[in-house]
From Swiss-Prot:
Biological source species: Protochlamydia amoebophila (strain UWE25)
Stated name of the protein: Acetate kinase
Cofactor binding note: Mg(2+). Can also accept Mn(2+).
Site positions for Transition state stabilizer: H182, R243
Compartments where found: Cytoplasm
Binding positions (substrate): R94
High-level lineage: Bacteria, Pseudomonadati, Chlamydiota, Chlamydiia, Parachlamydiales
Oligomer status and interactors: Homodimer.
Reactions performed catalytically: acetate + ATP = acetyl phosphate + ADP
Residues that, per the record, bind ATP: K15, H210, L211, G212, N213, G214, D284, M285, R286, G329, I330, G331, E332, N333
Keywords noted in UniProt: ATP-binding, Cytoplasm, Kinase, Magnesium, Metal-binding, Nucleotide-binding, Transferase
Pathway of action: Metabolic intermediate biosynthesis; acetyl-CoA biosynthesis; acetyl-CoA from acetate: step 1/2
Chain's role: Catalyzes the formation of acetyl phosphate from acetate and ATP. Can also catalyze the reverse reaction.
Gene Ontology BP terms: acetate metabolic process; acetyl-CoA biosynthetic process
PANTHER family per UniProt: ACETATE KINASE, ACETATE KINASE-RELATED
Length: 395
């Protein structure tokens, strides 16, 4: 049976998943690997059906050698699920920024890789790593077609007045406009929640909260992106792990003029030293909760404040709200943050079931039975969505 391999390359981890071409549901991966690079000793875990390994330490810190070692576990060892490499017919890659060039999956060639590279200045934390992952797997699987699936593509349905900045129009003509990100995750959650909702006559209005180290909201009407908090780059919008989110642009001009900061220093500070880390001393929300000091509490309060006001803005874009969804590492696991956010949005008709909110991490509804607005927690499955997008494009 033909199979599709998916790579989701991140700054501190690589996720690999293998699916058959008969993808039925998000839990249908035949094989999964998760490589963690952000520790002193890089490690990975493997999953094959219900069988899951303990962390296995890599014998190298080289990304290239580490991925090669893990990929070979597809056909070697206790977690092997294929006998020969040629059982894999397609490979899908997540790419964060597709700009105005890519609105659907695309077969990767030299020209596409050049375009992805040229867009790296707009997503410096992501596109270079995505491109590195593509080139690594191309060397391992040189005769297999590789496809790119873009996080920006889901937001192509935003209207002109939403994606256009109030700056000189000539800038827009040169491609400076709002693109939005986390589209693969937002699209996945919208599809999953559709299964929970009874058909209704009026358009279904969902706000999806993807809260991880990067964070964004998406206003979704009947499965289509209407508005989102990220923009030209993944720096706009909510407060994030190490990124500032939206700030007064006058601050940047002031710092360049009066603080003797170079463009490179300013870029680094806003991308790597701001957000939760800049205020609370760490980008890890679990540590923010654990520190219990003035700065960590301020960071948490700021995060929730910007989250709730962002949800309010997305509600205005939709003209109402039928459902709210939390996903991503923070969204799925931080019950306190969900509770505080929903309490402060009670005026919208959000009524949280506190007991359901505390439960495990499976997909679930966590609102009261009679809550006017339904609230969900969904474990995002970007790799499945990438595989499905590739197969739909091919057929």
């Amino acid at each position: 049976m033909p199979k599709v391999l998916v790579m989701n390359a991140g700054s501190s981890s690589h996720k690999l998943s293998l699916f058959s071409d008969k993808i039925e549901n998000a839990g249908s991966a035949l094989w999964k690997a998760h490589i963690e690079w952000g520790k002193k000793n890089p490690s990975y875990t493997l999953k094959n059906g219900s069988q899951e390994s303990n962390p296995i330490y890599l014998q190298t810190t080289s990304v290239k050698q580490g991925i090669q070692e893990v990929i070979e576990k597809l056909w070697i060892g206790d977690f092997a699920v294929i006998k020969e490499v040629h059982e894999i017919e397609w490979i899908g890659h997540r790419v964060v920024h597709g700009g105005s060039l890519f609105h659907q999956p695309v077969l990767i060639n030299a020209s596409v890789k050049k375009d992805i590279s040229n867009l790296s200045s707009l997503a410096p934390l992501h596109n270079p790593i995505n491109l590195e992952g593509i080139e690594l797997l191309e060397k391992i699987f040189p005769s297999i077609p590789h496809f790119a699936v873009f996080d920006t593509a889901f937001h192509r349905t935003m209207r002109e007045e939403i994606k256009t900045y109030p700056i000189p129009y000539e800038w827009k003509e040169k491609g400076i406009e709002r693109y939005g990100f986390h589209g693969i995750s937002h699209s996945y959650c919208a599809k999953q929640i559709k299964k929970w909702i009874k058909p209704q006559e009026t358009p279904f209005k969902l706000i999806n909260c993807h809260l991880g180290n990067g964070a964004s909201l998406c206003a979704i009407r009947d499965g289509f992106s209407i508005d989102t908090t990220m923009g030209f780059t993944p720096m706009e919008g909510l407060m994030m792990g190490t990124r500032s989110g939206s700030i007064d642009p006058g601050i940047l001009i002031y710092c360049l003029r009066n603080k003797n900061l170079s463009l490179e220093e300013l870029d680094h500070l806003l991308n790597f030293e701001s957000g939760l880390k800049g205020i609370g001393g760490t980008s890890d929300m679990r540590e923010i909760h654990a520190f219990k000091n003035k700065q960590s509490q301020l960071a948490l309060d700021m995060y929730i404040y910007r989250l709730k006001t962002g949800i309010g803005a997305m509600t205005a874009s939709l003209g109402g709200i039928d459902a709210l969804c939390f996903t991503g590492g923070i969204g799925e696991n931080d019950s306190y943050l969900r509770k505080k956010t929903c309490e402060e949005l009670a005026y919208l008709g959000i009524q949280l079931d506190l007991q359901k909110n505390q439960g495990g991490n499976q997909d679930k509804e966590i609102s009261l039975h009679d809550s006017p607005v339904k609230v969900f927690v969904i474990h995002t499955q970007e790799e499945w969505m990438i595989a499905k997008s590739c197969l739909e494009y091919l057929t």
